[in-house]
Every structure is written in C-alpha cells, then in structure tokens.
C-alpha cells in the first residue's frame, strides 16, 4: 500500500515537535505552579497555630482544604490540556485568543533575545482550528524573531480580514548569528498543511487564512 503524503506528514510532525520543545518550559511552569501551591497549602494544614480557638482552626482547615482541592483540579486540567499539543481534538479558537496564547508562549523567547513584538490592537475575527493554527502561528513568530536584530521590534497587524502581517524593521539580524529555531521553509510547510498561505517580502511576512474561516468585523 502506498502512502504518498507520508513524508510530508512526518515533516510537519517534526516541525511541530521542534516548536513544542521551544515552548515546553512555559507549559511546564503552568503545570507545576498549581501543584507547588497545593503542596504549600497542604504543609500549612499540618501546622495549626497554637492556642487558636477550635472554630477558627476548623474554618482555617476547611479554607486550606478547599484551596488544595482547587489547585489540584487546576493542575490536573493543565496536564490534560497538554494532550491538545500532541493530537488534534478538533477544537477551535478565536483568532484573538490564539494570538494572546502565542503572546504568552513566546514571552521568554523575546526576553532572552532582547527583541520585542508590538501586538495588534485590533484583530479581525476568525474561528480557527486550534491545533494546526497554534503551531503555525508559533512557527511564524519564532522564525520572525530570528530575523530581528537585538533590541529590534516586530510589528504585527491582524486588522485586515483574512491576513496577518508581520512588519520587520529596517535592520535584520546579523547573518553570523545562530541559525533560526524555525526556518521560513518550515513555516511554509505548516501553512500549506493547514490550508494557509505564507507570502514573504523583504520587510513583511504575511499569513493568509483559509478564506472560509474569516468573518470580517474587528475586535479590540
């Protein structure tokens, strides 16, 4: 039996795993944060204040117990959410929510590289397949960050329905710098696989959304 698309599928998966490796420290922090707080609250449960009235102790224990339960539920929910990075469950996300999530995930990359992104103030609404679109948006951003010189700013524009644009400053990164984490070719690979299209010009990289996913009205 022949599988003509298998090499392309494997290539897409390979790029997705590269991206996951880049954002995993942030995801790990999201998982460990609630669990660490729950451990602290559990330790406080074992250290009751001396001489406190019985009613106050009972209320304190109940409050801390509720906190532990809530934190554990949050941690479990975050762990389950990691599955959405490994397989497509068919979930959709609004364009604004997707870009906001990407903003959080690339924050450390920007901080360490001394680069900044001017995020769009208005975003044309679109409901996007979360799995493929999130990987594509992250690939686009990570590749663009590599194109920036230190202390440079990238400007994103998502106000026009059907297209996201990234405008690069005049000065690019030093050609002798480290190779990009994600290459433009890999961004194009993910775009084609997800039904998008990337267009690169000297100072502007544009991602064209699949036409059936755009709606038209601007969101703040």
Tell me what each language-model feature is:
Residues 2-5, 9-12, 16-23, 31, ...:
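Histidine phosphotransfer helical core of two-component systems
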Residues 21-44, 48, 127-156, 180-193:
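Conserved ATP-binding N-box helix of the HATPase_c
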Residues 59-116:
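Conserved DHp (HisKA) dimerization/phosphotransfer helix of two-component histidine kinases, i.e.
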Residues 116-128, 159:
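Conserved catalytic submotifs in the C-terminal HATPase_c
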Residues 158-190, 216-219:
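Glycine-rich/acidic phosphate-handling loop/turn and adjacent ATP-lid/helix
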Residues 167, 203-218:
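Short C-terminal beta-strand
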Residues 193-194, 213:
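Beta-strand-enriched, solvent-exposed domains that form extended recognition/catalytic surfaces
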Residues 194-205:
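Glycine-rich ATP-binding loops of the HATPase_c
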């Amino acid at each position: 039996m022949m599988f003509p698309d298998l090499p392309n599928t494997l290539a897409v998966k390979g790029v997705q795993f590269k991206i996951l490796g880049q954002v995993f420290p942030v995801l790990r922090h999201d998982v460990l944060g609630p669990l660490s707080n729950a451990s602290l609250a559990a330790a406080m449960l074992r250290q009751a204040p001396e001489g406190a009235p019985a009613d106050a102790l009972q209320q304190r224990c109940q409050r801390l117990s509720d906190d532990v339960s809530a934190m554990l539920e949050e941690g479990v929910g975050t762990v389950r959410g990691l599955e959405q990075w490994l397989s497509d469950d068919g979930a959709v996300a609004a364009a604004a929510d997707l870009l906001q999530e990407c903003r959080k995930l690339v924050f450390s990359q920007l901080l360490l590289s001394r680069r900044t992104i001017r995020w769009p103030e208005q975003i044309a609404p679109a409901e996007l397949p979360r799995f493929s679109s999130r990987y594509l948006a992250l690939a686009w951003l990570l590749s663009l960050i590599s194109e920036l010189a230190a202390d440079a700013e990238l400007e994103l524009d998502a106000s026009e329905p059907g297209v996201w644009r990234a405008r690069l400053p005049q000065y690019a990164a030093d050609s002798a710098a480290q190779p990009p984490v994600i290459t433009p070719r890999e961004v194009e690979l993910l775009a084609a696989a997800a039904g998008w299209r990337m267009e690169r010009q000297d100072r502007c990289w544009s991602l064209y959304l699949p036409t059936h996913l755009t709606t038209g009205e601007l969101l703040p």
